């Protein structure tokens, strides 16, 4: 089965990101495909490379990045939600006069059209969070 995932919550204030990660990992290990992972609303906070959790806590951003590396996942961050929360790549930093970027290199910023395409291409769109 081909899945698309939508994550609407940040990495440390809600269990949605952890649940989505565990779902994705289990699905991929069982041979299913994930067409795209789309981070929306507060879920865009899963993409910042500046997250630094305590050593005894899980690093959900790195977990997502490692899963993306292992399975060549398309990890898309909503541009509007990212801008509102200060998540920028080089293009957005340049367009908005920012002097730094903070998106993890395994993620990319794009628009809601990517979510629509994922919903069309996948057999199921699974949404995590409110």
Swiss-Prot record:
InterPro entries, per the entry: DsrEFH-like, Sulphur_relay_DsrE/F-like, Sulphur_relay_TusD/DsrE
Keyword entries, A-Z: Cytoplasm, Transferase
Active-site residues per Swiss-Prot or TrEMBL entry: 78 (cysteine persulfide intermediate)
Pfam families, alphabetized: DsrE
Compartments, record wording: Cytoplasm
EC category name: transferase
A cellular component term, taken from the record's GO annotations: sulfurtransferase complex
GO molecular function: sulfur carrier activity; sulfurtransferase activity
EC number per UniProt: 2.8.1.-
GO BP: any one term: tRNA wobble position uridine thiolation
Entry similarity comment: Belongs to the DsrE/TusD family.
Summary of the function given for this chain in its UniProt record: Not known. Could be involved in the oxidation of intracellular sulfur.
Protein name: Putative sulfurtransferase DsrE
Gene (UniProt): dsrE
């Amino acid at each position: 089965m081909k899945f698309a995932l939508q994550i609407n919550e940040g990495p440390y204030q809600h269990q949605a990101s952890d649940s989505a990660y565990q779902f994705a990992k289990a699905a991929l290990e069982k041979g299913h495909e994930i067409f795209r992972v789309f981070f929306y609303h507060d879920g865009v906070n899963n993409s910042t490379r500046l997250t630094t959790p305590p050593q005894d806590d899980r690093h959900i951003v790195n977990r997502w990045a490692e899963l993306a590396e292992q399975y060549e996942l398309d990890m898309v961050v909503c541009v509007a939600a990212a801008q509102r929360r200060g998540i920028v790549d080089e293009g957005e930093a340049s367009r908005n006069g920012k002097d730094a970027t903070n998106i993890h290199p395994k993620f990319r910023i794009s628009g809601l059209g990517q979510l629509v395409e994922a919903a069309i291409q996948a057999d199921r769109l699974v949404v995590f969070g409110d």
